[in-house]
Amino acid sequence: MATSGMVSPTSGRPFSPMRSSVLTTTGSAIKLEHVSEKFAGLWTDLEQEKQARRIAEATRMQLFQESVLRLEKSMEAEVKRRAESDKQLQAHFEGELRVLHERSACQVAEMHNSLKSAIDSFSSRVQDLHAVIREERDQRRNDIEHLATSLVGKVNECVAALDEERTIRMQEQAMALKRFGEDISGVNHRVDTEKAQREADLSGLRVEIHDVLANRNIQDEQFKTVTLDELNAFKAALALEREERVAEDDEIVQAINDYTRALQEGLKMVNMQHNSA
C-alpha cells in the first residue's frame, strides 16, 4: 500500500521500482546488442582489410619476383652479349696480329732474299776477280820468263812493279771486303732494328688488347655491383614495409583486445546492476 502511493516526479504517474528495473535492463540489452553489432561490423571490416592487405602483398611480391626475374634475364643477356663481343674483339685482334706477323715474315724473307742475292753477286764478282788476277799473273809470269834472257837488268824493277801492283790490288780487295763487311753489318743492323720495332709493336698491341679486356671485365663487375646494390636496397625497403605492416596489425589486435576488455567490463557492470536490482 505504501508503494502504490508513490508518484513519479517527472511524469506524475505512480512510481514502480520493478518497472524501472525492467526498463533499465532493456536499455542495457539494446545498447549491448548495438555494441555487439558494431563489434561484428568492425571485425568484418578488419577481416576484409586483412584479406585486401594479403592480396596486395601477394601481388606486390609477385611483381617483385617478376621484376627480379626480368632483371636476371637482362643481366644474363648482357653478360652473354659482352662475352660474345669480347670473343669477336679477341678474334679481330688475333687476325690483325696474324696479318702483321705474316707481313713481317714476308718482309724479313724479302730482305733475306735480297741480302742473299747481294752476297751471291759479290761472291761471283770476287771469283771473277780471282780468275782475272790468276790469268794476269800467269800472263805476267810467261812474259817474265820470255823476257828473262834479255831483260835481266829490269827483272828487279818488274818484280818491284808486280809487288807494288799486287799490294795495291790487295789493298783494293781489302777495302772492297771492308766495304762489303760494312754493308753486311748495316743490313744486319737494319734487320735487327726492324725486328725489334716489329716486336715492340706486337708487345704494344698485346698490351692494348689486355687493357681492353681488363676494362671490359671492370665494366662487367661495376654493372653487377650496381645491380646487386639495387636488389639489396629493394629487399631492405620490402622488409621495412613488412615490419611496418606487422606493427600495424599488432596495433589493430591490441585495439580489438582493449575493445573486448571494455565490452566485458560493460557486461559485468550490467550483470552487477541486474543482480543488484
UniProtKB/Swiss-Prot annotation:
Principal localization reads cytoplasm
Region called Nonhelical region, residue ranges = 1-27
Positions of region (Disordered): 1-20
Q: Which residues form a coiled coil?
A: 70-90
Q: Where in the cell is it found?
A: Cytoplasm, Cytoskeleton
GO cellular component terms?
Answer: cytoplasm; microtubule
Q: What does this protein do?
A: Major component of the striated microtubule-associated fibers (SMAFs; system-I-fibers).
Q: What is the protein's name according to its record?
A: SF-assemblin
